[in-house]
Amino acid sequence: MKHIVSIGHFLNRGVIMGKIPTMQEARELLKEYNQDEFHLKHAEIVSGVMGYFARQYDPEHVEFWKLAGLLHDLDFEKYPEQHCIKEQEIMREHGYDEALIHAVASHGYNLTVDVKPEKFMEKVLYATDELTGLIGATALMHPAKSVRGLSPKSVKKKFKSKGFAAGCSRDVIRNGADMLGWTLDDLIARTLAAMQSLADELNL
């Protein structure tokens, strides 16, 4: 029963007894539905960013945060038209905890689902998902092709350029910052720092 844990204190929802997968189990499930290396790397980046913030704000539940990041786009490659809908079905079929399912689905709030980010962790996922893509695209324009020497100012400049990485929703990023009560500049700086902490591990 080592994978059945209580995260009730974290979610303020009482005792939770659904299955919380290990990171390895989650990766295996992710690869069952995703083969594109870009999608797999994005999942690892968002997972790493979530872990970075968890160590600051919720150190007792770092792996839970990382799992939410890893699985957030579980259905995107095979079911793009049902994104954040199909993944709920898949996770329920595997007996995953409803708290994890809610966290994963909530990053599609007002885009594909009406599952609202309620907890701080869910708001972090919602706010940083699109932003990691923008930062990654900005890094590729940098001479070093890496986030290592990137500045928040450079990211903010690209944020303002509507034609750059147009698939990264500026509205979602702004809304995420508002949900967290952070300024846009603060969100950019913190997320960039998170990605820089992962530069060696994920070759960013």
Question: What does each of the following model-derived ranges do?
Answer:
Residues 31, 44-47, 51, 85-88, ...:
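Predominant activation on well-ordered alpha-helical scaffold segments within soluble catalytic domains
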Residues 6-16:
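Short, Lys/Arg-enriched N-terminal segments with co-localized hydrophobic residues
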Residues 21, 41-45, 82, 119, ...:
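Conserved active-site and cofactor/substrate-binding residues in soluble primary-metabolism enzymes
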Residues 16-79:
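Acidic/His-rich, divalent-metal-binding segments that scaffold phosphate/diphosphate chemistry
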Residues 60-164, 174:
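Divalent metal-dependent catalytic cores for phosphoryl transfer on phosphate-bearing substrates
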Residues 154-204:
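A structured, mid-to-C-terminal "fold-capping" secondary-structure block
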Residues 3:
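Cationic, low-complexity basic patches in intrinsically disordered or flexible, solvent-exposed regions
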